[in-house]
Amino acid sequence: DYKLHKLGYKLIDPSVIFGLPIELLAKTFDGKFHTSPNTAMKSLWLNGDINDMRLNVMARTKVLKTYVTINNIAVAFVAIHNAIAMVHALEVSKINQRQGFGKKIMQQIAGWASLNGAHYLSVITVHNNFPAKSLYEHLKMSEVGNYHYRIKL
């Protein structure tokens, strides 16, 4: 990282990784799980901060995965590898934020992941996404790591 910095690569998207043992969150399992996203889910993502490139990465994922929604108000993607469920692209519609949908979808994900062999739940967000960080901290998830990208200027 230091060498990249010295070569003129700029730090972008500093991120924090949260995690917890899945049994601490897996309480329910009644969400709508899909093998591919429906039109409403894609629309919610595209109106948020998830672009087509990210959606294509999700589609190409080769491990056990699912797309989850709560009435197309909240959506997320989760994939399991080595008993770790990694949540990606959690999005709650702007008008429905701060109403508990983030917590509910994370519980749904944990329930699905637990039934599919995961023992640990993890999620990554950029450092300045304070609503997401607040949700994960409220869920008693611990900060377990950090990372960032670098790009050449």
Regions found by a protein language model. Give the residues of each.
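Acyl-donor-binding surface of acyltransferase catalytic domains
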Residues: 1-35, 150-152
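A structural microfeature
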Residues: 13, 72-74, 145
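Internal catalytic-core helix/loop-beta-alpha segment
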Residues: 36-64
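Conserved acetyl-CoA-binding loop-helix of GNAT-fold acetyltransferases
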Residues: 92, 98-111, 115, 134, ...
